[in-house]
Amino acid sequence: MDERLLSGESAYEDADLEYSLRPQTLRQYIGQDKAKHNLEVFIEAAKMREETLDHVLLYGPPGLGKTTLANIIANEMGVNVRTTSGPAIERPGDLAAVLTSLQPGDVLFIDEIHRLHRSIEEVLYPAMEDFCLDIVIGKGPSARSVRLDLPPFTLVGATTRAGALSAPLRDRFGVLSRLEYYTVDQLSAIVERTAEVFEVEIDSLAALEIARRARGTPRIANRLLRRVRDFAQVRGNGTVTMEITQMALELLQVDKLGLDHIDHKLLLGIIEKFRGGPVGLETVSATIGEESHTIEDVYEPYLLQIGFLQRTPRGRIVTPLAYEHFGMEMPKV
């Protein structure tokens, strides 16, 4: 798979930047008004009762701020956060080590929680429900189970694939929050805030232009701003203007709707070789040289969201909107 400027997944270079840009409170957090309002109520209620917050599941596309929200929850509750991920917890002992290190009220954040092995989930169930841990000591006939009490804690799980969670695990979360794609105005505010942190001057129209092409995703908006800033410093006077922004994004092959060369390859492949579809996923995969699960999980969601692609029982179909975007006429039936 090509390294994508427009991927919502976190890249290595994003990590330090995202940490420095991360808001510390719900008040500072831009967007996700519904999830934010609900969390404000649940956090305030837990603090009034002097209890830990119910376990929270944050789900939605990558790059929308799930990790940021997990840190904000801990900050608002006045506790520490321990961060790990589904793939990093390989054995029940790994999970036990993390759980036994928690202090009362702490937040345990597990990113990509859908990738936990089922055997590890089973260790997690009593920990979430009863704040205890069942450990098997020894092997064979002499093996015995020992129950350890854990301090009350809040598990915050994050996933891009809520449907991949097992029902028993999903049902143990008291708070489920779906994060939605951001509006252009919200992203523009995020771009201007990031530019302020960078100490870069930016025109409001340039911030809007970056926001329009950021696919509803703050991580992509910040990444595009970094690249446009480079052009502003080398090709301009350091100010991110509309002219510099349009030039930079054109050279980066990011079109006015936030589509890149891979999106173009996928859509035009279906249009030119299969008259717009319907065509099966495996055939599309062979045509553009990408794995089918990558097409389904990475490339298609945004195209479906903006109405350029349809999934039907007979296969993928390119819509009239996509033809219009490319200035092409739909084939006559």
From Swiss-Prot:
Molecular function via GO: ATP binding; ATP hydrolysis activity; four-way junction DNA binding; four-way junction helicase activity
Enzyme class: hydrolase
Localisation: Cytoplasm
Enzyme Commission designation: 3.6.4.-
GO biological process, one term: DNA repair
Binding site for DNA: R311, R316
Residues that, per the record, bind ATP: L21, R22, G63, K66, T67, T68, E129, D130, F131, R172, Y182, R219
Record note on domains: Has 3 domains, the large (RuvB-L) and small ATPase (RuvB-S) domains and the C-terminal head (RuvB-H) domain. The head domain binds DNA, while the ATPase domains jointly bind ATP, ADP or are empty depending on the state of the subunit in the translocation cycle. During a single DNA translocation step the structure of each domain remains the same, but their relative positions change.
Family assignment from sequence similarity: Belongs to the RuvB family.
Self-association and partners: Homohexamer. Forms an RuvA(8)-RuvB(12)-Holliday junction (HJ) complex. HJ DNA is sandwiched between 2 RuvA tetramers; dsDNA enters through RuvA and exits via RuvB. An RuvB hexamer assembles on each DNA strand where it exits the tetramer. Each RuvB hexamer is contacted by two RuvA subunits (via domain III) on 2 adjacent RuvB subunits; this complex drives branch migration. In the full resolvosome a probable DNA-RuvA(4)-RuvB(12)-RuvC(2) complex forms which resolves the HJ.
Listed name of the protein: Holliday junction branch migration complex subunit RuvB
